[in-house]
Each structure stands twice: as C-alpha cells, then as structure tokens.
UniProtKB/Swiss-Prot annotation:
Described function: This protein is involved in the repair of mismatches in DNA. It is required for dam-dependent methyl-directed DNA mismatch repair. May act as a 'molecular matchmaker', a protein that promotes the formation of a stable complex between two or more DNA-binding proteins in an ATP-dependent manner without itself being part of a final effector complex.
Encoding gene, per UniProt annotation: mutL
Pfam families: DNA_mis_repair, HATPase_c_3, MutL_C
Protein name, UniProt field: DNA mismatch repair protein MutL
Any Gene Ontology biological process: mismatch repair
Keyword DNA-binding: no
GO molecular function: ATP binding; ATP hydrolysis activity; ATP-dependent DNA damage sensor activity; mismatched DNA binding
Gene Ontology CC annotations of this record: mismatch repair complex
InterPro entries assigned: DNA_mismatch_repair_CS, DNA_mismatch_repair_MutL, DNA_mismatch_S5_2-like, HATPase_C_sf, MutL/Mlh/PMS, MutL/Mlh/Pms-like, MutL_C, MutL_C_dimsub
Organism: Rickettsia conorii (strain ATCC VR-613 / Malish 7)
CDD domains hit by this protein: HATPase_MutL-MLH-PMS-like, MutL_Trans
Keywords: DNA damage, DNA repair
DNA repair among keywords: yes
Family: Belongs to the DNA mismatch repair MutL/HexB family.
C-alpha cells in the first residue's frame, strides 16, 4: 500500500478518538468553552445521558458569522497568543474540540455576539455540509449535539449504560462548577433537573464555601479544615476533611491546578502522605483543593484530555501541598467528625435495626486496631496531672450505675467551663470515659485516645534522637507463623535498632529480642513482635525508611497505650482528657477512628422527646 494523505474528516475522527470517549467528554469540552467565553450562566440539557442529545447554552461573548465558520475548523482558537505558549490560562487552546465533536455527530451551533444585531447558525453532519445562516438567538451561544458517535459505530458500542454515562457527566459538571463559583450552572436530564447552582458574587472564600456546600454538601464543610497557604509563586486554598470524616474510595477528591480539574498522581500521593498519620490505608479523605501556580511552571499539554499535568519542580509542589494540608489539619486540632454524634443518635432511635451502622460509612470500623485490647501495663502515670478534679471513683459496669457521683465541688464546675472535653464523671465498661461539659456529655475511648497521644509522643522522640533502649533481663524468644515474617524482621534489623529494637534470628521461624524501646514500659514483647511482623511482611525488603518508621511507630503506639478493661482513677481520666486537648489531631486515632464522641444536651433531649 502506498503512503497517502488522510482526508480532513478522517483526521477529525482520529482526533475525536483521543479527546471524545463518551458524552461526558463532549460536555466537558463544550462547558469549558462556555467558561472561556466569559459566561455567567451555563445550561446543560441531556437526553439518554447525552447519547441522543446534548445542548449547551451560555450567555458568553458569542460569535459572528465569520467566527462561526472558523471555529469548526481544526486548530483554530481565540484563547491564546501562539508566541506565549508557556503562559496558558484558558481551558482550551488546541482548537480540536469543536471539529472533533462535529466529525462524529450532528452539530448545530447558534450564536449572537454581544451588542450585535443578528444571530447566526451553522449546521454540520459528520463534520461536513457547513452552512452559515441568519438566525434568532439571545446574546451567547447554544450548541446542539445529536446522535453522538453515529459516524463511528464501533465507539458507540463501547458506551456504558445510561446511568453510568450520566454519572460521569454529572461528575464533570460538578468539577467545573466547583472551580467557577461565580457562574450559574444547571443540568437537566430527560426533563428532570439534576443540578441547579446559583452563581455567587461575594468574596472569594465565601463564594467557594457556598459552592462546595451546594456540590459536595454541608456535612463536608462542617467536618473540613480550611486551607490557606501561600508562597511568592504558589498558593493553595480549599477544604480538606477531618480524618474521621473519610470514604472507602478517592472519588470525592477534587483537585484543581489553576482552576483546571485534574486527576494527577503526584497530587494524589501528596494527599495520601499528608494523611498517613491519621488514616488507615484503605480509607480516603474528602477534599476540594485549588492550587494556583505560575503557568510557566506547569505544563498542561501532556494529556489528550488535559487530566494530568507536569510540574517544573514536582517535589517542591508535593512538599508544599503536604505542608499546607498538615497545617490545616493541625489548626483543626482535636476536633472529631460532627456527623458521628448524629449517627449515634440514629442508633439510639433504631437499636434493633439489623444493618451496617451508619458510622461505618464515615470511619473505618474494620481497621486492624479497632478491636485491639493490649494487655500491657499503663504508662499513663507519665501524663501531666495538671488541673485535675477531685477523685470521682464512679465506675459504670455493664451500662448500670454502681455508684452515684457525690461531692460535686466548685473546681469541677470550673473544669467543665474551662476545658472542651470537660470533667470526668465516670468510666463505662472500664473502656470509655464519660465526661461532662457545660452543654454536652463526651464519651472517650481510652485506648484509642492514648494510642494517638503515644503516637505523637513517639514521633517527637524520633525527630530529635534515637529511642532509648531498655535491656531485657531475660531475652524474649518469639516464634512467628512462618519463615517469611522472621526473615522480614531480620532484614530490617539495622533500621529497627535505630528505632529502639534489638533482635537477632533464632532458628528458622523465631526471633530473639534483647532490647526494646524504653518508652513502651512493661510491654508484651510477644504481641509487639508479632504485630510488627504482620505490618512489615506485606512490604518485604523494599519498604522505604519513612514507611518503616510509620509502621513501627503505629505498632509502638498501640502497645504504649492504656488497655481497654483497666479501671482509671478520676485523676488519670482527667489527665488523659487534658493531654488530648493539648495534642493536635487527638480527635482520631492513627487509623481515622474517632477517639471521642460529643452528644449535645439538645440532642439528648430530643431522644426523650423534650
């Protein structure tokens, strides 16, 4: 076969194959064009999820008859100066979208330039039969796409069910709407309105907050930390969820570069690293984060759909994003998810409903540490005992009160007013601390709370020095289930030594331990080594030092913490509460589970119909 030139229509169909995968791709390209046209209102109408009909209407600057003719040709654009290719601020710039869409559909464009006397219309079928006529239309542009992929039936066969395609389109519109809170958006499918977002005209932070409430939900804002981070050539703003408000997938993570929605691996990894101290590995935070960067420091022309970008200095961007998120979470302090109390109240109302707890939608109740009950001796006596109340040796066992609280004194009342977690009143099942504030009761999981405190304490030690070791009077021999786990620990023995653990191989499946970190106190060495082996065996020899430290610190913290089932004095309970108040992110343990739940008095009154 001889070499020959492809026809213009064939070239456009090939280009469409790269850019237009489904109806959502068409909506994305056309809505982005409307945004670039300085629109304040964009309406989207779909039939059969866009397979039969897509209509995009805007009130933007519009086009003249000459501009209409040029707009449907390949590589024509009004959006940037080709001499300034490194300074792209618009969504589109390649000039491929309209001709590519026209090549695989029946397209009708009607447009009227602002302050013009006439509107014009152009009709294309499969990219051909271009004819401009005079029409009637308001200022702006309306684009109708019918019978998508009629010219490429093979692509049509690969489309998913209407529901799936519609979900993808709604997701696209939501992302663009989040980035442009001043623009009004509406989305109608088969006559039913799915989205109606009113444009906001207040200050930037208020506009963004309201648009996030409209798109993601009010619950997210209530359980999110605000990000406001700036450097001379870089700024990050947005919201990211508290660790206890999380999901089982990353679908609710909205990331933007210069208002362009992206699904960039670098940013996703940075987000993961920022939360690694607070979330189990199978849980994901929710976020809407906007990065503004000098266009010359980022290349948006590396992906056909512009979904990925390339940074001039990726490590710099990664580290800044991690720092921005951690700063925001630290400022959120020990606050836990506000939805948890509501879920608990629902459980009270429907105690016999045999279904998954709504709490499990927010937190990871299946994490490895969820049911962990260490048998080690508490090191709680190292906690500062400032501002403690008079001893209240009130213990609740099996949900029945054994002894009423007596001798309420003025100091306790001051404690309730002064401290967010209030004054300890009792202990439930020797596992949960009940405390009282001015307008609520707080239920604290003593093991999860102390595990978080221990985690932060051990991290602080590791930042400045090696952990102090204590030599075991009698070395401990730990037999592991298989040789792989024993080898894994032995392979990391030098790194573990710096983390306070001295061990050697003892036979095929056993490890002999001679020194442990002093901070762990009277720890169960057998359980410690077994848990550590479980953590590390999945990663083998190639685990990075930072990941190794993370796993070891998690394991140490779990064994450092006070056990469920141990009775605490009022002084110990109050000391734990005070230290929680002074520790950032103490509202959740290392796996994203809440360390405490607060029930407001008004919520309790609702339970009793008051």
């Amino acid at each position: 076969m001889t070499i020959k030139f492809l026809s213009e229509s064939t070239i456009n169909r090939i280009a469409a194959g790269e850019v237009i995968e489904r109806p959502a791709s068409v909506v994305k390209e056309l809505v982005e064009n409307a945004v670039d046209a300085s629109s304040t209102k964009i309406d989207i109408i779909l039939e059969r999820a866009g397979k039969n009909l897509i209509i995009i209407s805007d009130d933007g600057i519009g086009m003249t008859d000459k501009e209409l003719e040029i707009a449907v040709e390949r590589h024509t654009t009004s959006k940037f100066d080709e001499s300034d290719f490194l300074n792209i601020n618009t969504f589109g710039f390649r000039g491929e979208a309209l001709p590519s869409i026209a090549a695989i559909s029946k397209m009708l464009i009607t447009s009227k330039k602002r302050d013009a006397d006439k509107a014009f219309q152009i009709k294309l079928i499969g990219g051909n039969e271009k004819q401009v006529t005079i029409s009637v239309h308001n200022e702006g542009t309306k684009i109708e796409i019918r019978d998508l992929f009629f010219a490429t039936p093979a692509r049509l066969k690969f489309l998913r069910a209407d529901k799936t395609e519609l979900t993808a389109t709604v997701d696209v519109v939501k992302k663009i709407a989040l980035a442009h809170p001043k623009i009004s958006f509406s989305l109608t499918h088969d006559g039913k309105n799915l989205l109606k977002l009113k444009g906001q005209n207040k200050d930037a932070e208020t506009n963004l907050k309201q648009r996030i409430i409209d798109v993601i939900g009010d619950d997210f804002i209530k359980n999110a930390a605000y990000i406001d981070f700036k450097t001379p050539d870089f700024s990050i703003c947005g919201y990211t969820s508290s660790p206890t408000y999380n999901r089982a997938s990353s679908e609710d993570q909205f990331l933007f570069i210069n208002n362009r929605p992206v699904k960039d691996k670098l940013l996703q990894v940075a987000l993961r690293v920022a939360y690694q101290d607070y979330l189990a590995r199978d849980r994901y935070p929710i976020c809407a984060i906007f990065l503004q960067i000098d266009p010359q420091l980022v290349d948006v022309n590396v992906h056909p759909a512009k979904a990925e970008v390339r940074f001039h200095d990726p490590n710099y961007v990664r580290n800044l994003l991690i720092e921005a998120i951690k700063n925001a979470l630290t400022n959120k302090s020990h606050v836990t998810s506000t939805t948890i109390a509501s879920d608990v109240l629902e459980l009270f109302k429907n105690p016999l409903v045999n279904k998954q707890s709504p709490v499990s939608k927010v937190i990871n109740v299946n994490s490895k540490s969820a049911d962990y009950r260490p048998t080690t001796h508490s090191t709680l006596n190292t906690v500062p005992q400032n501002h403690v109340c008079q001893k209240l040796i009130d213990t609740l066992s099996h949900a029945k009160i054994e002894q009423e609280v007596e001798n309420r004194i003025e100091h306790e009342q001051q404690t309730r007013k002064q401290y967010k977690l209030g004054a300890a009143k009792a202990q439930l099942h020797t596992t949960y601390i009940i405390s009282q504030t001015e307008d609520s009761i707080v239920i604290t999981d003593q093991h999860a709370a102390h595990e978080r405190l221990g985690y932060e304490k051990i991290k602080d030690y590791l930042k400045t020095e090696e952990l102090i070791k204590q030599r075991l009077l009698i070395p401990e021999i730990v037999e592991l289930p298989n040789e792989k786990k024993a080898d894994c620990l032995y392979d990391h023995r030098e790194k573990l030594y710096k983390l306070g653990l001295t061990l050697e191989k003892f036979g095929e499946k056993s490890i002999i331990v001679t020194e442990i970190p002093n901070i762990l106190g009277d720890v169960n060495v057998q359980k410690l080594i077994q848990d550590l082996a479980d953590h590390l065996s999945d990663f083998g020899k190639n685990i990075a030092l930072t990941e190794l430290i993370e796993h070891v610190t998690e394991t140490y913290a779990c064994h450092y913490s006070i056990r469920a089932g141990r009775k605490l004095s009022a002084d110990e309970m109050n000391a734990l509460l005070r230290q929680m108040e002074n520790t950032p992110l103490s509202g959740q343990c290392n796996h994203g589970r809440p360390t405490y739940i607060e029930l407001k008095l008004k919520d309790i009154e609702r339970l009793f119909g008051r």
